[in-house]
Design a protein with these regions (language model features):
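A short hydrophobic/small-residue beta-strand
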Residues: 28-30, 204, 284
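Hydrophobic packing residues within well-ordered alpha-helices of enzyme cores
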Residues: 41-44, 72, 93, 155, ...
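ALDH superfamily catalytic-core signature
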Residues: 80, 88-224, 287
């Protein structure tokens, strides 16, 4: 049996990424969706049952994680726990699960490196989309942009001008570029992180405006090392720009956070691209696109605090099955 715990963002896709391979591997599944967005999982279960899935194969439980998590994770019938969410919860699951297989994606602080030969016409909109779609509530969202000194002024002006044209509003409006945060509590947290960075010397280039749970896309520079925006996962519509003098410095700064999910580099040089591929300590390096580039056929996961194991159709199926050796002596 597989225990699957999913986050509030992309609730249908996240459930499908876990339920599909688990069922394909012959497992029963107990799915615990985020309490803020449970309806997608319930609709998925209904559609599968109406399509002929045998009773008991997919079981959806809803409620607060604090109340349901202990029972799900510690139950001896659950042989694998697959979880997408925060590091604290992931560490808690690791302690409670005992000797079980675990597959966990625990977040990121995704860096993008922009080198002097980068095509800024391509880089600027791609980075902005990767940073501010879903109000940054995406584990692959861009959080840090490491820009070479030689093009920093040009890039920052273009980037801020592009962000100024983004439309903030309701996610039900198809013209909206940046939607609201999932809750007032999360908006409070993101606002406090921006305030901390500003108090310690960061400069706001655009944004730092709030209306209810809507935080306008915010871009900062001179963010000091060690503040939360610099080294933790913001999970909000905030990007920090950094000057770097070389590719080597950019890679070193990209690697100094405790996460390693996705990173990206914009360059026309294959030599520089492969240097980044070899030296960035992450699960995926995206060349000339945003960190949020992903296809379901790709192995998805990271290094360090970004988690354990890999998702993606074939790779998740491998995680959710056991290898058995059978020998016949005839």
């Amino acid at each position: 049996m597989v225990g699957a715990i999913t986050p509030f963002n992309d609730p249908l896709a996240m459930a499908a990424h876990k339920v599909g391979p688990a069922l394909a591997g012959g497992n029963a599944v107990v799915l615990k969706p985020a309490s803020a967005t449970p309806l997608s999982a319930l609709h998925l279960a209904r559609e599968l049952m109406e399509s002929g899935l045998p009773p008991g194969r997919l079981n959806v439980i809803t409620g607060r994680g604090e109340e349901l998590g202990e029972a799900l994770v510690s139950d001896p019938r659950v042989r694998l726990v697959t979880f997408t969410g925060g590091v604290e919860t992931g560490e808690w699951i690791t302690r409670r699960a005992g000797i079980k297989k675990l597959c966990m994606e625990l977040g990121s602080n995704s860096p993008v490196i922009v080198l002097p030969d980068a095509d800024l016409e391509r880089a600027v909109p791609a980075i902005a989309a990767g940073a501010f779609a879903q109000a940054g509530q995406n584990c692959l969202g861009v959080q840090r942009v490491l820009v070479h000194d030689r093009i920093y002024a040009s890039f920052s002006k273009r980037f801020v001008d592009h962000v100024a044209r983004l439309r903030a509003g309701s996610s039900l409006d198809e013209n909206t570029d940046v939607c609201a945060m999932i809750s007032a509590r999360e908006a409070d947290r993101v606002e406090s992180w921006i305030a901390e960075a500003v108090e310690k010397g960061a400069r706001v280039l655009i944004g730092y405006r709030r209306e209810g749970t809507l935080i306008w896309p915010t871009v900062l520079e001179n963010v000091p090392e060690g503040v939360k925006l610099d080294c933790q996962e913001v999970y909000g519509p905030v990007v920090s720009l950094y000057r770097v003098a070389s590719l080597e410095e950019a890679v070193a700064r990209a690697n100094r956070v405790p996460y390693g999910l996705h990173a990206a580099v914009f360059t026309e040089s294959l030599r520089d691209a492969f240097y980044a591929v070899r030296h960035l300590d992450v699960g995926a390096v995206i060349v000339n696109d945003s960190t949020d580039y992903r296809l379901d056929v790709m192995p998805f996961g990271g290094t360090k605090l970004s988690g354990i194991g890999r998702e993606g159709i074939r790779f998740a199926l491998q995680e959710m099955t056991e290898t058995r050796v059978v020998c016949f002596n005839l």
